[in-house]
Amino acid sequence: MKRKTLPLLALVATSLFLSACDDRSDDLKAISKFKDLTPPRFSDVVSRQDDVSEEWSQVGFSSGLTLQVLRTRESPDGCEGGSYYYLVDMEEKTVQPLMNALCIADNIKLEYHEVTDPYTKEKYFEYSHDGKLMGRLLIPSNPDNRE
């Protein structure tokens, strides 16, 4: 019984791993078709899963995955040892760089969270390092996403 179970478990684990790789590749293909809000275009920097070095995701209670931050392996022009960071809004189908002209070294880790303005109800995405706010980015709605 044990001899039959072990190969079956290995087969299941391998197929799950391979399907997860396919899902990530499919996710990147879908994201590359999202509306780019500001340059540089996501598809110009990321073409395959190996181009992404780190991912951060926020999951909504009702809608599932809502926001993702993707840290790329490519450095902006004139920035040695830095990375591009992209904010992906899965709900609105938009993508935009977190920092267009800011060079962040690879050893700096950012923390992220979403904030809603209590008066205007606009959504913002804040990123910080060591508890210090580094930036705030408006999360706009995408009119192309409306049916």
UniProtKB/Swiss-Prot annotation:
Main localization of the protein described in the UniProt heading: membrane
Membrane topology note: Lipid-anchor
Subcellular location: Cell inner membrane
GO cellular component, one term: plasma membrane
Segments traversing the membrane: none
Keyword Cell inner membrane: yes
Keyword terms of this UniProt record: Cell inner membrane, Cell membrane, Lipoprotein, Membrane, Palmitate, Signal
Xref: Pfam families: YfjS_YafY
S-diacylglycerol cysteine: lipidated positions: C21
Coiled-coil regions listed: none
Cited function: Does not induce degP when overexpressed unless it is mutated to resemble YafY.
Family in the record: To E.coli YafY.
Name this polypeptide is given: Lipoprotein YfjS
Gene giving rise to this polypeptide: yfjS
